[in-house]
Amino acid sequence: MEPGFWHEKWHQQQIGFHQQDINPFLVKYWQKLGLPADTQVFVPLCGKSLDMCFLAEQGHQVIGCELNELAVQQFFSDNQLEMTQTTVGEHQHYHTEQISLYQGDIFTLPKTITQAVTAFYDRAALIAWPESMRAQYAKQLASLLPSGSVGLLVTLDYPQEALIGPPFAVSPTWVEQHLSDDFDIEVLASQDVLADNPRFIKKAVPWLNEAAYLLKRK
């Protein structure tokens, strides 16, 4: 995922990856992580996801990282949240009492920002990367997370040749092969969601599975 590609998607508002509702797997499985209310939760490539509002409603401190400035601004305006903006190194920091979003490149995000994080949530980050860049992102995510951090990973899998991503197909095999060095992995669920995704139906994608994993940083 090149920065120019991502910025153009947001500029043209071609954001079919943005969900209008809170992710059902997040609602169903988040409590399984057993986190106290004041937990700091890292959300990589957060966009303007409503899932961050859900996490804040659980009492968590949400720390997001997003490349595109418009996405960050729309998150606060769409949810009618007053925010303060400051500059932190190469990143712009937008924050309210419970939500802090760092606008900029996740590969240059200082580790000091996530040093107190004990949980993370990845629904749209791993699947945003083409396979050629995905492993690099996975290593960067691991490097930002303190040992013992727990998280919920949500992926999509489908025949990649049937559709040009993003979102890109991430198979259970890929997850095991590329994440198991840094994380303990537990499969929570895997289900057919093709009927709920008209874009995939329109492109004649034959099947579409959404999976949820519980990850623990080693």
UniProtKB/Swiss-Prot annotation:
Q: Which GO terms describe its molecular function?
A: thiopurine S-methyltransferase activity
Task: Report the InterPro entries cross-referenced here.
Answer: SAM-dependent_MTases_sf, Thiopur_S-MeTfrase_Se/Te_detox, Thiopurine_S-MeTrfase, TPMT
Disulfide bond: present as a keyword of the record? Answer: no
Catalyzed reactions per annotation: S-adenosyl-L-methionine + a thiopurine = S-adenosyl-L-homocysteine + a thiopurine S-methylether
Query: Which GO biological-process labels does this protein carry?
Result: methylation; response to metal ion
> Can you tell me which residues bind S-adenosyl-L-methionine?
10, 45, 66, 123
Q: What is this protein called?
A: Thiopurine S-methyltransferase
Q: Which organism is it from?
A: Shewanella baltica (strain OS223)
